[in-house]
Amino acid sequence: MTAAFLIYLWIVDELTFEDFQINRDSIYRLVAVEQEGGGQVKESVYTVAPLSKVFREEFPQVENATFMLNFGTLNLHSGTDLIEATYKYVDTTFFDVFSFPVIAGDPGLIKKDPQQIVLAESTAKKLFGRTSAVGREVTCQFFGQTFRYKVAAVLKVPRKSHITFEVQLSEQAYYEPINWDFVEGTSVYIQLRKGTVLSETDWRKMSRVWLNHRDKGMRLEFQLLKDIHLQTSFKDPEVGNHGNMSQIYLFTVLAVLIVFMGAFNFTTLSTARASQRFKEIGVRKVTGAKRKVLVMQFLSESLVQAFLSLILALALTELLLPLFNRFVEKDIVLTANWQTVLFVLFGIIGVGCLAGAFPAFYMSQFNPLQSFKGGSSTGKKGTLIKGLVCVQFVIAIAMVICTSVVFKQLHYLQNADLGLDKEDMVVADCGLFDFMSYMGGYGIDDYKQEVLKNPNVRSVTGGVELSDYLQGHRTEENSFSWTNEAGQVDSLRMVGVAGDGDFMETLGLTLLKGMSFGADKKAYMDGAYEKELPIVINETAWKMMNVEDPVGMLLQNKGWYGEASRIVGIVKDFNFQPLREKVKPAYLYYSRRLLNTLYIKISPENKAETLKFLKEEYEKMRPDNVFTYHFFSDALNLNYVHERQLGQMFLVFTILAIIVAMMGVFGLVALSTVQRTKEIGIRKVNGAHSRRIVWMFCREYMVGVGIAFFIACPLSYLLMLRWISNFAYQTTISWWLFPLAGCVILLIMMLTVIVQVGRAASRNPVTSLRYE
């Protein structure tokens, strides 16, 4: 029951995301839908800000609409304190639509004064400690310029919100006009009027708003706020850890199975214990007790035991919650609400009746004479109980197999050859050049020259963040066209990966043909290439172009940097997305403006000293910035948080399932030894050794494990085959996992039987024969 409680709390937590939002049932997020080549559909949460105004003005069903611009990090100063924080620009209507809990102040003030900002509670504590942050002044660094703001309010950002932030600023403070052409990081939300029911025609009309206002617009879909956490099937850059309805269903079934396993064991143990009460039942029947009275007696005893077990389960759940929260990375608490009360009542009545029904009706069926003789071991009863234990073996073996496959796939994901070097690679945010005048100075080069003087620094490069590139964006993809040998125009959509001249060498990319795009900055002036942009394509792009040797080909492209691109080389495929996705056709190019990340390859020795040196050199050049870094391998592993959590939960509940299954074996063996005490005594009198008697019992249960094994193997194989199909790159479901799982359960079962039967077989035969 403790396992069922923990799963129940986890499921409730997953199902109640966004519940703190007052308007959660009427808020929708706009999703852009783009038709790609081959009939593929790409969805993105990024649209354009003017859509919010259009929906407010053109659709009476829409009560309000808002947008937010999602950006990276900024540096906040308060006196001598300096921190790095994530930030967003929000529309003036943002706090009319969303209802984040207000700790202090008035977030609505940023409507009137763009020099006011809103802080998250955690950010306010970092800057001001326990003193009030409202009305205090903070200084922000934007692209080399300093801005001063006053704190309007401090908000609590619940964990169960898909919108997370540390700082919010008014969109009126943004330095560029936010118009129909501005797509980068813009999420739009609409709020319908209460009680509004939109027809299919209304939804269809609303879905074409962007198309109607701009030629380059896209079709829109509308995602209910409450559905974002569990029913987002596309990549969402604003949510780092989406839930999954499949996992909800999976663990619901798992909880039910564990409860049934516990109830089956309760039935077996109750029957074994009740078998010792035949004389009591006979006496009560002789004195006039009706069968209904006996049934009620057994059921009431079962309900009392279920009640006591649930009280203990609740206490154990409270004790285990901190450990469980560490496994699932949540902060779940056990609260007394009506859902929990209903769950407890269902547990008491359901488990009590389910577990007590069989012994109650079985024991009360005998007439007084049969009861005084010790009852009758009917074949039906023995077969049923053995069948229940066999079902538990099926569940336990299947869970061992599934857990093994999950961990094998996770190990594969974390250790697969990505086509690039991820070990001992320090990744740092790149704030070393002035964005507003990047043509004039290039601080990254200065930093590279300084840190490369340290022998523990092997190479440095600037590029885009690759730990989960794309992340739902569509702005990195461009369509290229060329004329093939037949004189026809071919085209291919490719993903652009920006880096400097040392990008390929530092990341360990393998050049297959041609050359890199070089490191001469004079030849690469963003937005002003004299002739053509040199690019290096990957293997996938080469194959999809269907050209024998594309090196030297000129491609046409209507990108922001120019109209023509020259292929100068081909690089071996490398993964710039999680291994759920296949490698997409991509091209590498030089762009100083897009170098938002530093990759620093360091020696595995003296890491602490090297990191300290990197930090000191960075802060010498940019004393107003915070040097934040992580290791590339750690960032890549974060892509598989769901798989790691799934594996950990499977491991915990597999161990519990094995324990529960072995308790079932223990109960069945206890029942068998009670019923066969005289048989054991007679066999010993006739010369049978204790080991032979133990083997006789083991052989019976080995048959049950064998039957369970042949049922569990195909079931678990089909289940894992379906799960593993979610990954473009998969481990093999190795054949040896199946006999390994069977052997684990068989070994534990035999140890349980040997301990229990060994005690009965070691009794004096005289005592055994006198027993009945």
Sequence positions of predicted segments:
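Interfacial "coupling" helices/loops that link adjacent transmembrane helices in transporter permeases
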Residues: 262-303, 664-702, 756, 763-764
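Alpha-helical transmembrane segments of integral membrane proteins
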Residues: 1, 237-240, 270-307, 318-437, ...
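Mid-to-C-terminal secondary-structure elements
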Residues: 91-104, 117-246, 449-638, 642
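Small-residue-rich transmembrane alpha-helices
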Residues: 6-9, 302-366, 408, 699-761
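Membrane-helix entry/capping segments
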Residues: 206-255, 275-278, 290-291, 320-343, ...
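Hydrophobic alpha-helical transmembrane segments of multi-pass inner-membrane transport and secretion
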Residues: 1-12, 243-279, 384-409, 644-678, ...
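Short juxtamembrane loops and helix-capping segments at transmembrane helix boundaries
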Residues: 15-24, 160, 164-175, 231-239, ...
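Membrane-proximal extracellular/periplasmic loop immediately following the first transmembrane helix
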Residues: 8-73, 177, 183-194, 202-203, ...
